[in-house]
Every structure is written in structure tokens, then in C-alpha cells.
Amino acid sequence: MAKKSLIYREKKRQKLEKKYHLIRRSSKKEISQIPSLSEKWKIHGKLQSPPRNSAPTRLHRRCFSTGRPRANYRDFGLSGHILREMVQACLLPGATRSSW
């Protein structure tokens, strides 16, 4: 189980990312449309003004049940060992263990 502080920190980053998403997207669009290099630098400075934690690259996908940030499966939202336990206990419909 991940520490509660890390989970709350991740939730805070998600809120910040949603808040500044439109600003980042519009700034990037402006940079691609303007041919002047000096104007691009000004817009690039504006792009750096939002908080660092509002960048989408700083977000991690976390396990739904344990909060583990690594080895997550997108389709289920679970980490690898929890996914394996749930499949073995038949708690995930449609998921089967492979055998060949």
C-alpha cells in the first residue's frame, strides 16, 4: 500500500493539470502558428509560467486498490500482482489465465 501522502500528492497534480490544460494547449498552438522566433520565445516564457506539477508528464497512473505507481495495466487500473490475485480469485469477468 502506498503512503497516503503520495496518493494525495498525485491527486493534487491531477487537479493542477486539469486547471492549466487549456493554457498549455493554447500556448503550444500559438507557438506552432507564429513564424517569428522572438514571438515564439515570448510565448514559450508564458508556457513556463504555470506550476511544474501541472505538466501532464509528471502524472503517474496508480493502482486503484493499492496506489502502487508501477506495473499498472491500463485496461484494469490495477498493478500486476493485484491483477494476478483478482484473476485467480475470478473477480475480473472475462479475464483468464493463459495456458498452452
Curated annotation (Swiss-Prot):
Its main location: plastid. It comes from the Eukaryota. InterPro entries: Ribosomal_uS14 (IPR001209), Ribosomal_uS14_bac/plastid (IPR023036), Ribosomal_uS14_CS (IPR018271). It is found in: Plastid, Chloroplast. One of its GO terms (molecular function) is structural constituent of ribosome. Gene3D superfamilies: 1.10.287.1480. It holds the Pfam family Ribosomal_S14. One of its GO terms (biological process) is translation. NCBIfam families: PRK08881.1. Part of the 30S ribosomal subunit. This is Small ribosomal subunit protein uS14c. It comes from Lepidium virginicum.
